[in-house]
Regions:
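Adenosine-nucleotide cofactor-binding segment
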Residues: 1-61
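Well-formed, non-transmembrane alpha-helical positions, independent of function
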Residues: 17, 61-64, 86-87, 138
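C-terminal hydrophobic helical "lid"/dimerization subdomain
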Residues: 12, 20, 60, 102, ...
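Conserved beta-strand positions in the Rossmann-like core of class I SAM-dependent methyltransferases
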Residues: 5-6, 73, 96
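Helix-to-beta-strand junctions that scaffold the AdoMet/dcAdoMet cofactor pocket
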Residues: 66-68
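Short strand-turn motif at the edge of the Rossmann-like AdoMet-binding core
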Residues: 75-79, 98-100, 123, 127
Length: 153
């Protein structure tokens, strides 16, 4: 497992929620653009980068804090982006794509059902399915929500 988890985002609400589920440190890169500078020393600090936003700037910032021969797992799908191949090659990064964790879905459901993983802190809103339009509008606004749940009971 990871010995230290650092999460970045542009909203304080999201960062507060990831602290609840175990992040050791959080950085709001919108209000503290130099918040990762301490991790840049000695060619990088982290062994693994999981980029979940699909944002080109987020991926590029990760290049600066990832150790040589580090692993980048790209989960976010933001369309076409440009990456500095010179850095990718010079630091010998291993860049991997991961699409929605298809293989892990059944395991994730099992862990939640057994109470071994608590996702409740990640759910910012829970609405009855009859309010699906409001739920989708909330889900589309990252400044208002993190994860929106529809209930059917």
């Amino acid at each position: 497992g990871a010995t230290e988890v650092v999460a970045t985002d542009v909203t304080d609400q999201t960062l507060a929620r990831v602290r609840q589920v175990g992040a050791d440190h959080t950085v709001n890169v919108a209000t503290h653009p130099d918040g990762l500078d301490g991790y840049k020393a000695d060619k990088g600090y982290f062994d693994v980068l999981i980029e979940a936003s699909g944002n080109a700037q987020a991926l590029r910032a990760g290049f600066d804090v990832l150790k040589p021969r580090g692993i980048i797992v790209q989960v976010g799908t933001g369309g076409e982006i440009s990456i500095p191949l010179n850095v990718l090659v010079a630091k010998e990064f291993d860049l991997r794509g991961s699409f929605r964790f298809h293989e892990e879905f059944a395991l994730a459901v099992e862990l939640m059902n057994k109470g071994l993983v608590d996702v409740k802190p990640l759910i910012s809103h829970s609405l009855p399915y009859t309010q699906f339009e409001e739920a989708f509008a909330l889900a589309a606004d990252r400044h208002q929500s993190m994860k929106v749940q529809l209930t059917f009971a």
